[in-house]
Amino acid sequence: MSNVSSRTLTLGSRAVGDWSKALHAYAQREKDLILSSVETEKPRDDQSIGVPVQVMIDGPYGGCSIDLGEYESALLLSGGSGVTFALGMLDDIVGRVVRLGRRGGERTKRIEFAWCIRSFGGYHQGRVGPRFHLLIKAAAGHIHWVAPMLMDIASVVAGCPSLDIHISIFVTCLCDPEAVPQIPNSVVTMERPSTHQLLNDMITPPVGDAVDGLRWVGSGGGLGVCASGPSELTREMANAVAKLSLTSAEEVGGVGLHTETFVL
């Protein structure tokens, strides 16, 4: 939604069962076909390779219980494949603010996008028809299939002076930080995130003129929090919000919370 030139639906799947592994194998075969065709004939920039596949979409099953547009600040925390939910929420609110010009009265001024992963890894991408992309994770972590979308969204926000975004990536294994793609206004930390610290950073004014990450927009505008990923992560964030004092919550302007649990 934030990228006006995109009219596709991206589906994320983690290869852990028979069906998802078969889907992963399909995406790999299509990738090999694309690479082989490039070797014999260089495709045009606007040329895409489509494969007709019959799909059936079931739902809807509901959405986020809070509207991020009602809050001046938003914190999106995800772990592992929970990033699929957080990324969709990010794309939605950025599109409503930037592309649609706050048509619905959106108040959002700043967004912290925090993602906890095990490793950087890689990805396989396939295309099934003109409006569907498949991004298949073969193992945990794998920042590279999310990075292009994050870079696109960050670039869109860069042209909007009324919206600020900061991206924090927490890696819990010993990896090479230089392997991370360059995403605007992002930082990579080799540690597990503290949900309490992330929350406090969003509601605590900076000391003096120091600004690390998001700019301060003042108190009273409210904070919308979405946490998606393993149950331990979502539970920690729910506990962090619950431990806020009534006074702190009132000074912030209210705190809204939505959690989505992603398990194998």
Question: Could you say what each language-model-derived stretch is?
Answer:
Residues V4-S6, L11, V16-C64, E106-R107, ...:
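Reductase modules of NAD(P)H-dependent flavoproteins
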Residues L11, G79-S81:
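Hydrophobic alpha-helical cores of multi-pass transmembrane domains in eukaryotic membrane proteins
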